[in-house]
Amino acid sequence: MPELPEVEVTRRGLLPHVVGRRIADVIVRHRGLRWPVEPELEARLTGRIIGRIERRGKYLLLECLPPADATRAGTGEDAAPGWLLVHLGMTGTLRVYPAPPAPGAHDHLDLLLAAGPDTAEAEPVVLRFRDPRRFGAILWTPLAESDLPGHPLLSRLGIEPFDPRFDGAWLHRGMRGRSMAIKQALLAGDVVVGVGNIYCSESLFRAGIRPTTQAGRLSLARCEKLAVAVRETLAEAIARGGSTLRDFVGSDGSSGYFQLDCFVYDRAGEPCRICGTPIRQILQGQRSTFYCPHCQH
C-alpha cells in the first residue's frame, strides 16, 4: 500500500508536468473504485486549470481552477475553484505520459492535459490513474481551501509529521492514557498522520522502542526519540523514492528503493544490522510487525 512517502514522491513528480495545464478531456473507463466516480466528474473537470497539488496524509489534493470564461460569467460552482481528492488505495498509481500506451484493464481514468494560460509552449500529456485492486478513490469537492480541513475524509487526520508543531511533547500528549500498543497507536493516524506499516516498524527500531510497548507508558524522553525517528525515516524514504514492494511506481514509472536498506521490515530471521540478533516477526492487528528483540525494549 502506498504510504506517505510514496504519495509525496508522486506529488513531487507530478508538479512540473501537471501544474498550470488545462484539463482538455476526462476519460473514465471504470467508475467502481472504493467510492464510485460520480457521473458528473467529466463535466465538472473539463476546461479547468490545475493550480496546485497538495498532500494531506495519504491524500493528493489537486486544485482545479475554473476556466476564465466561467469566472467572467459570474457566480456558481462552475465559477469557483474546487479540489480533486485522490487516494491511491493499495495498488494505485498516477503516471504522466507524453504519448500513453493503449489503456489496460486496470487503467481507470485519464486526464488529457493541454497547455494552459501560463504553459503555452507545453506539449499535451495524459495523467493516468491505474489501480488493479480498485481500493483507490477519485472524488470531487467544491470546498474552498479554508474549508478543506473539515472534509469528512480529512477532518480526523492527525498532524503532519513534518509540521513544526510535531515533536516529542505532541506525541507524548497524544499517547497519554492509551492502553494499545505503540505501533497500533501510530497506525491509527489521529495523533500523527502517514506513519504506515513499513515506516512504523522502521521508526520504532530507530527509536529503540519495542512495537508491543503500551503507548500510554512511553516517557516524554522516549516520545522525543520516536518523533525524531518518524521524521528521519519518512524524510529518508521520500529521498529514496519511497518503497516498491509490489505495485508502486512514481509518476515517471520509476521504482522506489528505500526497502532495500530497511533495518527490520520484511527481514524476519535475518541478522540485525546493528547487533546481529535475528529479526523477529509478529502479527499486530492482522499486520506484520518486525523488530529486533535486543535493540528494542
Curated annotation (Swiss-Prot):
InterPro entries: DNA_glyclase/AP_lyase_DNA-bd, DNA_glyclase_Znf_dom_DNA_BS, Formamido-pyr_DNA_Glyclase, FPG_cat, MutM-like_N-ter, Ribosomal_uS13-like_H2TH, Znf_DNA_glyclase/AP_lyase, Znf_FPG/IleRS. SUPFAM superfamilies: Glucocorticoid receptor-like (DNA-binding domain), N-terminal domain of MutM-like DNA repair proteins, S13-like H2TH domain. GO terms for molecular function: 8-oxo-7,8-dihydroguanine DNA N-glycosylase activity; class I DNA-(apurinic or apyrimidinic site) endonuclease activity; damaged DNA binding; zinc ion binding. A zinc finger (FPG-type) spans 263-297. Its cofactor is Zn(2+). One of its GO terms (biological process) is base-excision repair. It comes from the Bacteria. CDD domains: EcFpg-like_N. The active site is at 2 (schiff-base intermediate with dna), 3 (proton donor), 58 (proton donor), 287 (proton donor). DNA binds at residues 106, 133, 178. Binds 1 zinc ion per subunit. Keywords: DNA damage, DNA repair, DNA-binding, Glycosidase, Hydrolase, Lyase, Metal-binding, Multifunctional enzyme, Zinc, Zinc-finger. Its EC number is 3.2.2.23, 4.2.99.18. It catalyses: Hydrolysis of DNA containing ring-opened 7-methylguanine residues, releasing 2,6-diamino-4-hydroxy-5-(N-methyl)formamidopyrimidine; 2'-deoxyribonucleotide-(2'-deoxyribose 5'-phosphate)-2'-deoxyribonucleotide-DNA = a 3'-end 2'-deoxyribonucleotide-(2,3-dehydro-2,3-deoxyribose 5'-phosphate)-DNA + a 5'-end 5'-phospho-2'-deoxyribonucleoside-DNA + H(+). Signal peptide: none annotated. Involved in base excision repair of DNA damaged by oxidation or by mutagenic agents. Acts as a DNA glycosylase that recognizes and removes damaged bases. Has a preference for oxidized purines, such as 7,8-dihydro-8-oxoguanine (8-oxoG). Has AP (apurinic/apyrimidinic) lyase activity and introduces nicks in the DNA strand. Cleaves the DNA backbone by beta-delta elimination to generate a single-strand break at the site of the removed base with both 3'- and 5'-phosphates. Belongs to the FPG family. Monomer. This is Formamidopyrimidine-DNA glycosylase. The gene is mutM.
